[in-house]
């Protein structure tokens, strides 16, 4: 099984805070049957403003983690990727760090309380460049909680939808859980 959206590499963003925390996360993942993880460090997000989020730094963190994993006999493969914060510049930042699947996909996160109207054109422009947008955890966005038709618009525009497993369990709040369940019921998501 592949964990598609994870912040496992230490000290890069608001995910793992230490090597020990990353190893604990990996032990849990292994117990759950996960064999591969796509690390999706935040990119151009206000949470990481001013931090060095580069392919080199991510690779260094992964190698450090691999060394420690080998000592514990953990053999989960970690792929490098990002969760790109929506700004109108998405087409201009297509590169190996901001995309995955050989440049074919970009995981995109919006503000929890606002989905800009301009995003429709930006997502279309990404598609025209051969990059399929994957909308990260839409069930957590207030505009989607209030109007699920936004998910249909994204799907009709060729986007894919990724839900957060924590939303389905209720650990991210009741509104996210209700919206996630509705998205699943309507068969609108491709990744959990």
What annotation goes with each model-predicted range?
Residues 1-74:
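An N-terminally biased module of ancient metal coordination in phosphate/nucleic-acid-related enzymes
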Residues 6, 42-43, 83-84, 138, ...:
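Active-site metal-binding loops of divalent metal-dependent hydrolases
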Residues 7-16, 148-155, 163-166:
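Metallo-beta-lactamase
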Residues 30, 127, 184-185:
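Non-catalytic positions within long, well-ordered alpha-helices that form the structural scaffold/packing
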Residues 48-162, 176:
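Extended substrate/RNA-proximal surfaces in nucleic-acid metabolism proteins
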Residues 142, 168-170:
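Short gly/pro/ser/thr-enriched loop/turn and capping motifs at secondary-structure boundaries
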Residues 173-183:
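Short loop-to-alpha-helix "cap/lid" segments that border enzyme active sites
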Residues 189-192:
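Short acidic/histidine-rich active-site segments
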